[in-house]
Amino acid sequence: MSDPEMGWVPEPPTMTLGASRVELRVSCHGLLDRDTLTKPHPCVLLKLYSDEQWVEVERTEVLRSCSSPVFSRVLALEYFFEEKQPLQFHVFDAEDGATSPRNDTFLGSTECTLGQIVSQTKVTKPLLLKNGKTAGKSTITIVAEEVSGTNDYVQLTFRAYKLDNKDLFSKSDPFMEIYKTNEDQSDQLVWRTEVVKNNLNPSWEPFRLSLHSLCSCDVHRPLKFLVYDYDSSGKHDFIGEFTSTFQEMQEGTANPGQEMQWDCINPKYRDKKKNYKSSGTVVLAQCTVEKVHTFLDYIMGGCQISFTVAIDFTASNGDPRSSQSLHCLSPRQPNHYLQALRAVGGICQDYDSDKRFPAFGFGARIPPNFEVSHDFAINFDPENPECEEISGVIASYRRCLPQIQLYGPTNVAPIINRVAEPAQREQSTGQATKYSVLLVLTDGVVSDMAETRTAIVRASRLPMSIIIVGVGNADFSDMRLLDGDDGPLRCPRGVPAARDIVQFVPFRDFKDAAPSALAKCVLAEVPRQVVEYYASQGISPGAPRPCTLATTPSPSP
């Protein structure tokens, strides 16, 4: 029985958006010798491209006289799926006390994105000199690993018996508080149980909280447990306390049916009473850890992001030969379709191993018979609509425009259903191997809104997300209904979407911003949607691919 006056510590949300922390482990092979007598003293400097400049974020230790170093110091970064996060790895010789790569100390460098590293788990690249040529046979290997444990949850069940009675005319009303010890040795409240009225042998309700909340993911961090007798005045009577760690709690309940117990000690009584033993006993009846999988768990476990593009070729875009057309191919400035393609596709392609993307058009009359189609391959190869990388999608788009007649209406359901077909096959495997993301670029209101709602509701039960970017200055108010931010989307028959899978953004909100701003906005929801889908299906990530840096240790620094 709980009391509203107690101000219970709320349970944290099950899933939070934001960054994951990634650790990069680095090794090099075959570094160039600066002279014939000595081997280099290598160090790797990591830079991140941020705010239009390269900024040093981490560096390894220096290893002495080693041409194939395996560095022990990890390079830690915050990872965001929706950001490009370009990285540079600079290798230099620190023999003469150098702290940065100069011409005389530079051994080579390489560039890649953090997304490329985490999607492949292990990346090996040649080192390049400043003139762009390879540094002999020198290579650098980077292995990514997510910092684990930060998303795990703990289920705990406590009871107590023979607690001291603090009430004159009735029994105590016990509750318990749990505190963790911070780095500065202060105590922070992490949980407060409910009050059990008039009972010296209380059984508190099971509760669940994140491992981060309980002990900051440090199983050795001291935990303090305080038991009180509740008083409505707020002056609760102290019964006793004990200390433990999460590791001790796990070990004490490791076997089925095994429980752990502590004496509940009141230090004042212990110091004053010679025969004092305890003020009761507290028992931990259950301690289980629930692994909450993250987006990176699925990506590093082999899940690929299958990216498909759908482009609106309806007449409302305007004649492509006109400078006022949304499809105008100006040599000076890429149109909004191209800008959105590059911004969003440039990130998604890092998560697809073959980097081949199906690209479709809708709302145009197409050769040879110039009949209206709402899901035609823009490379005009219906048997193989895939394009090589985003640059291939852009090239196909440019070749396609002069060959088609912009028409209408703006029907989106056919392309959603087309992408849903392979997603349906993927669902039947029961594995987390491929998640589909459909990018729809359109200039106006959807004509087949009822059919589109039905298609989205169906797709919400599949491993699939939909990103809609509105191009131009049309009224997109109806499009926002598909987003589901104001409540679950329903099909015309009233069936609700199983989850929110649509993100709609008008491009005009970002036309004066950096391209990365659009990508950040439209892709921010994808990691949550991926995790939500697989969690709802009870599908765990695949085992991370085994990665090793080297078979022999480097010389000591």
From Swiss-Prot:
Kindly list the cofactors needed.
Ca(2+)
What SUPFAM superfamilies does this protein map onto?
C2 domain (Calcium/lipid-binding domain, CaLB), vWA-like
The protein's superkingdom reads Eukaryota
Function (record text): Calcium-dependent phospholipid-binding protein that plays a role in calcium-mediated intracellular processes. Binds phospholipid membranes in a calcium-dependent manner. Plays a role in dendrite formation by melanocytes.
Domain C2 span(s) in chain numbering: 2-127, 134-263
Family matches, as Pfam families: C2, Copine
Alphabetical GO biological process terms: cell differentiation; cellular response to calcium ion; positive regulation of dendrite extension; postsynaptic actin cytoskeleton organization
Annotated binding of Ca(2+) 2, by residue: 167, 229, 231, 237
Residues recorded as binding Ca(2+) 1, renumbered to this chain, are 167, 173, 229, 231
Q: Name one GO molecular function term.
A: phosphatidylserine binding
What's the protein name? Copine-6
Residue ranges annotated for the VWFA domain, each copy included: 306-526
Query: Could you tell me which residues belong to the region Linker region?
Result: 244-303
Predominant cellular place of this UniProt entry's protein: cytoplasm
